Structure formats: C-alpha cells, structure tokens
Amino acid sequence: MSMTPREIVHELNRHIIGQDDAKRAVAIALRNRWRRMQLPAELRAEVTPKNILMIGPTGVGKTEIARRLAKLANAPFLKVEATKFTEVGYVGRDVESIIRDLADAALKMLREQEIIRVRHRAEDAAEDRILDALLPQARVTSFSEEAAQTSSDSNTRQLFRKRLREGQLDDKEIEIEVADAVGVEIAAPPGMEEMTNQLQSLFANMGKGKRKARKLKVKEALKMVRDEEASRLVNEEELKAKALEAVEQHGIVFIDEIDKVAKRGNVGGADVSREGVQRDLLPLIEGCTVNTKLGMVKTDHILFIASGAFHLSKPSDLVPELQGRLPIRVELKALTPEDFERILQEPHASLTEQYQALLKTEGLNIEFLADGIKRLAEIAYQVNEKTENIGARRLHTLLERLLEEVSFSAGDLASTHDEAPIQIDAAYVNSHLGELAQNEDLSRYIL
C-alpha cells in the first residue's frame, strides 16, 4: 500500500461525501501499515496497529468507508457483523472463525493474483491441448514420411491456432480429457465450519488426479482447460506461505454493528452471550494465535476497525478492556440537506447517474434538474427527522418511489418522448412525493 493518506482520502472522496475525520483516521491507519513494513525487523515486531472505533448514526458512510477501503488496500480484508457471533459454548459462530475467514480471503486474493500472472502461459498450454484434440496425430511408417508429416502438421496447426484465437471454432464439439472435479457439499450446524472445511479438503484431495473424457464445445473446453492449466502452474505451498504472511502483516478486519453486543446500561435480560462475545473478541484484538487452514495465524498485527450506531447504548457500555483496545475514536456526523444534495450528484456512479443509465437501456432519457435534486434532498432530511433516521439509505426509498411510474412505463414513454428527456424538477418531486412527505403517518409506512 504505497498511497499517501492524502491520496487515500482523495480516492474515498470520489465515493463518500463528508465524514472527513473518519476518512483521515482510516487513511493514516492504512499508511501506517506501509510505514511499519519499512522498519527494521526488530522494531517492526514492536509496532502494533492502532485499532479504530467509528461511532455514528446508520446510513452516514461507516460501512461504505469499509467497502471502499477493501478495494484500495489490496490486502486481506474481511467485513463481519458482530451480531453473527456468540460466546463459546452457545450455538452460533465463535469469533475465531473471523481469522479463519480472513485466511480464506487472503488465499483467494493471492491465488487470483497468481493466476493473472501465469495467465499467458496457461492460455498457450490450453490452446495446445485443444489443438491436440482437434488435430489427432497421424501414424507414420518411415523417417521421410515423418519429416513431411511434421511440416504439414505445423502449417495446419498454425492455421487452426489462428482460427481458434479468432473464435471461428467456438461451436465445434470435441472430446477432451479434463480433471474430474469432486465436489462434496457437507451441511453442518453453526460453529462446525472448521471441521466442515477439513472434511471438504479431504474429499477433494482424494479425487485429485482423476481424469475423465468429456464432450464439450471448444469455447467451454478452452475455458475449462485454461483454468486447469493455470491451477497447475500455481505453487500451492508457496501460495499458502505468502497468504499466511499477508494475513499476519497486512490483514484488516472490519467489525460492524459492535454496538449490538454492548450491554445497554443496567438493563438485565436473557441475552447472556452479549458480553461473552466482547470478552471473546479481546484476545483476538490484543493478539493471540488461531489455527487456520494456512497454519497458525498470529493476530498481533491485524488491524481491527469496529463501527456502530450506538443508538440504544454508548461506547462506554462496551467492556473497559475492549474500549482500551480500540484507542482511536472517530465520530461520524448525521447528514444535512446539503450532504444529501451532494450525495445525489457528486460521487462516482451516483444514484441519479445509476437511474439515468438504467432507463437509458430502454431508450428513455431522464434529466435531474438542480431544483429537483434540492427538493429531493430536503424531503429526505425531513422524513429522516420525523421518522427513523436511516441516513443516505432514505434516498434509495425516495428515488424508487419518485421514479416508480417512469420505470414501469419506460418502454412506452421512450416511444412517445423520442430524444427529449423527462425532466425531474421541484414540481415533479412535489407532485410525486410532497403529500407523502407531509403526512407523517404515510411517510412512516411508505417512505
């Protein structure tokens, strides 16, 4: 990760409006991963990541920051919901499965990168196998015949290779030997994922090396053989060693909905495993060793980012030890009408841009005017204030409602409007959403 914090924030700004403090915090944390790797080995072992707690209402960009960060980081990344886990001893997933899933994600990411690296060699090998199936070797009886045959075969082979690359042979059917995949689906109760993975690996290895002849069209066969050749060129043991190092040194875990496992004040109840989940998370965040399919993974240098709305609880309701392990606190602000206005226009592939592109597929043009966008932003803010504040997600509901009629009759409208776009202005927004926004009972159930 060689991007500077400023470059990371700039990239996040393309997709997320506002929340500068949160962007700066994650940008610094991400850059510190790179800085740490430049240190001498002795000092590097002592530098631990500063974990982050993001606090803010729902729909303001916490999860979106995590999603975009995953794409930027080019590092093993996993997003989990804290509510999915239970205390050890209860039915459900235990928190150690977070690291096992992160290890799987790292292996998958590195395998994809390695397959891209060997792709050209795999394509050449796959083409040769397809050509062998298309052009069986003729039998020869003398050396002179063999020389003439070789020259003729070489010319024919080059001609067929050219036709294969141009796609002229795609629909031709051939018989070819491919690996016989052994797929075993094992249904297991929650919490037994590790045993299930081991059993699946065992059955997969038992079937390794088995081959079977199949009749396929050239296009399908080429893809199957290319994947097979790429897998053969990838060194699995080396890949596992790299993945293990990537998890330990660069891994990032985003734990969403952390507030849902916080004990709410002095409220008692039957949900005994809430605090247990927090206590199980402690050693994971502090640093422990977890057994995974890659081997033993040390979690000392994995970066943890936790987030929660904290509507019904406060960060201080988390157990004190967990609070101490999330030293960087970032508060995300609730969205204003101006933020809603910017969200509708500024991000890369904004909501308005998406709807325009979707309707364009049917030949219908729609145009969002400035006053229409402003009115839409105001209604989103008003409905959030009057009912539940769900942040930017309110815009999805409003836009679906606003364009419902247009989406339903897009094909008919395209033929009547020709090239002239349907203009979405303030009057259009008021006529479709005004009454619903004013009537609190209706907006509570419909918007």
Swiss-Prot record:
This protein's superkingdom?
Bacteria
Q: Name one GO biological process term.
A: protein unfolding
Which cellular compartments is it found in? Cytoplasm
SMART domains according to UniProt: AAA, ClpB_D2-small
Its GO CC terms? HslUV protease complex
State the Gene3D superfamilies in the record.
1.10.8.60, DNA helicase RuvA subunit, C-terminal domain, P-loop containing nucleotide triphosphate hydrolases
Q: Could you tell me the keywords of this UniProt record? A: ATP-binding, Chaperone, Cytoplasm, Nucleotide-binding, Stress response
Q: Known CDD domains for this protein?
A: RecA-like_HslU (cd19498)
Q: Which residues bind ATP?
A: 17, 59-64, 256, 321, 393
Any one Pfam family match given in the protein's UniProt record, by short name? AAA_2
Q: Where are the transmembrane segments?
A: none
Give the principal location in a single coarse category: cytoplasm
Q: How does it assemble?
A: A double ring-shaped homohexamer of HslV is capped on each side by a ring-shaped HslU homohexamer. The assembly of the HslU/HslV complex is dependent on binding of ATP.
Q: List, alphabetically, the HAMAP family matched.
A: HslU
Family in the record:
Belongs to the ClpX chaperone family. HslU subfamily.
Protein task:
ATPase subunit of a proteasome-like degradation complex; this subunit has chaperone activity. The binding of ATP and its subsequent hydrolysis by HslU are essential for unfolding of protein substrates subsequently hydrolyzed by HslV. HslU recognizes the N-terminal part of its protein substrates and unfolds these before they are guided to HslV for hydrolysis.
Q: What is this protein called?
A: ATP-dependent protease ATPase subunit HslU
Gene name tied to this protein: hslU
